[in-house]
Amino acid sequence: MTVTELLRVEHLTMKFGGLVAIDDLSFSATQGEITAIIGPNGAGKTTIFNCLTGFYKPTIGRLTFSVLGRDPVYLERMEGFRIARAGVGRTFQNIRLFPAMSVLENLIVAQHNELMRASFFSVAGLFGLSRYRDAESDAVKFASQWLDRIGLLPDADRQAGELPYGDQRRLEIARAMCSKPTLLCLDEPAAGLNRNESAALNELLRNIRDTYGIGILLIEHDMSVVMNISDHIVVLDYGKKISDGSPVSVRHDPRVIRAYLGEEADYGLAPIGSGLPC
């Protein structure tokens, strides 16, 4: 692996009985870049995330995660909590905040790994030792910084479930970032957002990429988001990779247009309203 290659997926196959959800998929994601995974509904995109984050164990394949200065780890061999500790963060298609907890508390909970280490796995926390108190104070400060960054600091004490939908989406990304990931996996973060909210999301993701230098894996159906912010795009159809390259090359790939529009499509440029930007 090169020094900037963060994730390498090799020959990933995921079967559910006789159904092949992912079929011999290989691609890589680079540190400091946004890699989008797109494809029609049912193409297997979320299944990839479930394999990367330990929800599923792949039938076949190697998932190599390599952070500069550390030994590579193989995600297919690891449990989900160990994958999170290794530096892989994730959001979900359906928002999974803790709705009855405050906005601030949702971001503090995301830092549980560091708080547990500071508490010697609850001993220091139980007795209120200074190391744990300092870590708890740092967690509150870090959470507050993220709330300020996404414009939700005035809502810190509000229940997360009371926030408007777009704010909940941003809060979920901030919560994932509070785990301090090296690879951030975002599953349809623009789902349900209006045009202004999508534009704000684009700016937030660019800022995360440029400020923190992490790798971002993005599953998204909103092609305006994908084409505006992605450095690299992988296209799936029925679990197989059909294209892999820059936004420009993918947009004009006949195989991609065929997957979205059908066999009879004109493969010159995607027509307006097709879901692929012209």
Residue ranges of predicted features:
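Glycine-rich phosphate-binding loops of nucleotide-dependent enzymes
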Residues: 2-278
